[in-house]
Amino acid sequence: MAAGSITTLPALPEDGGSSAFPPGHFKDPKRLYCKNGGFFLRIHPDGRVDGVREKSDPHIKLQLQAEERGVVSIKGVCANRYLAMKEDGRLLASKCVTDECFFFERLESNNYNTYRSRKYSSWYVALKRTGQYKLGPKTGPGQKAILFLPMSAKS
């Protein structure tokens, strides 16, 4: 490949590619840093979800997995559990993937990401300034609590 050249890969069927990226682990593990209070989203092995400021906590290492375009599941690598939003807006970690474990991932204009529940479509993953999760019905666009910056969690 010559310096300055660009290589393109087929992405659409008419270009010789598939219609969508295959589901799977296509990203390196991440830490999700919340703008509100400076906490990292943490998934505990017992199913609890909260935020912690300690960068070395092993339970903040998360695997984001694409399920379809714009939709991800978030798995705690150490906890081996999936982030889920329940019907009352609580965040918890499930041992298996359910329809409550899928979130619309969106890059906002301020370069932070938001994670909105696919099942409860007006509710977001959010952390309060105390590090506790915020109930889904109390979240909405424009809140700092819903803004997350994905950071590398490579060892």
Curated annotation (Swiss-Prot):
According to UniProt, where does the site described as Important for interaction with integrin lie?
128-129, 134
Q: Where is this motif: Cell attachment site?
A: 46-48, 88-90
Keyword annotations from UniProtKB, A to Z:
Angiogenesis, Developmental protein, Differentiation, Growth factor, Heparin-binding, Isopeptide bond, Mitogen, Nucleus, Phosphoprotein, Secreted, Ubl conjugation
This entry's Gene Ontology molecular function terms read: chemoattractant activity; chemokine binding; cytokine activity; fibroblast growth factor receptor binding; growth factor activity; heparin binding; identical protein binding; integrin binding
Positions where Phosphotyrosine occurs in the chain:
82
* Region (Heparin-binding) residue spans: 128-144
Q: Which domain of life is it from?
A: Eukaryota
Q: Where is this region: Disordered?
A: 1-20
Residue stretch(es) of the prosequence: 1-9
Where is it chiefly localized? secreted
Function recorded in the entry: Acts as a ligand for FGFR1, FGFR2, FGFR3 and FGFR4. Also acts as an integrin ligand which is required for FGF2 signaling. Binds to integrin ITGAV:ITGB3. Plays an important role in the regulation of cell survival, cell division, cell differentiation and cell migration. Functions as a potent mitogen in vitro. Can induce angiogenesis. Mediates phosphorylation of ERK1/2 and thereby promotes retinal lens fiber differentiation.
Q: What is the protein name stated in its UniProt record?
A: Fibroblast growth factor 2
